[in-house]
Amino acid sequence: MVVQMQFVTQKYTKGCKYMNTFKEAKKNFGFGCMRLPMLENGEVDTVEFSKMVDAFIGAGFNYFDTAHGYLNGKSETALRTSLTSRYPRDAYILTNKLSGNHFEKEEDIRPLFQSQLEACGVDYFDFYLMHAQNKKNFEQYKSARAYETALELKKEGKIRHLGISFHDSADVLDMILSSYPQVEIVQIQFNYIDYEDEGVQSRKCYDVCRKHNKPIIVMEPVKGGSLVSLPEDAGAILDSLGGGSYASYAIRYAASFDGIEMVLSGMGNMDMMTDNVSYMKDFTPLDEKEYEAIDKVVKIIRSRPLISCTDCKYCTERCPQNIPIPQLFACMNDHTKLNLWRANYLYNKYTAEGGRANECIECGACESACPQKLPIRDLLKAVSAQFDK
């Protein structure tokens, strides 16, 4: 895209390698363990996950990312089963996070941290991030001395590098990094749709990280899969390039920026793994023709009122009505993209046992948890108007 392309080419020389501030990382692509292969009984398919881990490490990658709340704790234990119990400790990098909904005061943090080590089957974390930082929960972390406790754990050798993951405006990020210059790395949402988005502020947050000389980890490079399920006319533009999956352009876009040391992808099956590894094993930045194509894709997507939900499910964890909000938003997006029959079919399937959009009581708990700052209550009213007939 015109703005993005100028920004990238000023900072990334074709053929150069990424900075790799942290030498433990073998490549600039990581396995996000928020969305794993699942069995029908709701458990992680550790047989399939183990195969994916083997393929990932076998291709020369070694970075894994999890959090205590991912899959209700099953992500951590699946990593113990499929990764840490099967490989020597120096074969992988493991990142975990301190999530605000799992502690209230300083005394809660060390026991929680120890439980995370045990769940993952390790003695230390390579990276430990203050999770989903924003203006509101940063006050909770400060009052509980979360950063100070993490720095103490680092001195004890239980954390190698301290970082944050972030979901808020650039000025808040600037404030946090100014308050705690000991933070070594920042994880931000970054993709070609959110680059100039005023809600997510990918570009502005990127600029703040560069201002503070902080290496960057990227989450949501395909925006929860929405940059894989493109409208037909947008997809045709990428198809015209003559090769590469839709995910490949999104992930390579993020990885092409100077200072971005790691791009995460949540891979739920071996097909995703195979595709991602194929173009990140020997990474090359996007060329001018590819940037121009992405610019056209952005214009098409922005011309349509799609709901920018990433399916993180933070909202559903808070919803007292058990409304499957991300799935209902996906149905609405399908309808907008003219997949009318499938949208109605899936809506009825997802709500067969309750949780229809019209059951929202407008408590607002979902909106306070949403990293995308979506007006979920209003959006559910629109969903209800479309499907609850």
Predicted features by range, described:
Residues 37-40, 44, 54, 103-222, ...:
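Glycine/proline-rich, positively charged
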Residues 70, 86-106, 131:
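Structural motif corresponding to the early beta-alpha repeats
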Residues 75-79, 169-174, 273:
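Short, well-ordered alpha-helical microsegments
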Residues 46, 57, 61-62, 81, ...:
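Structured C-terminal cap/extension of enzyme domains
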Residues 27-31, 64-66, 94-96, 128-130, ...:
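Hydrophobic faces of well-ordered beta-strands that scaffold small-molecule active sites
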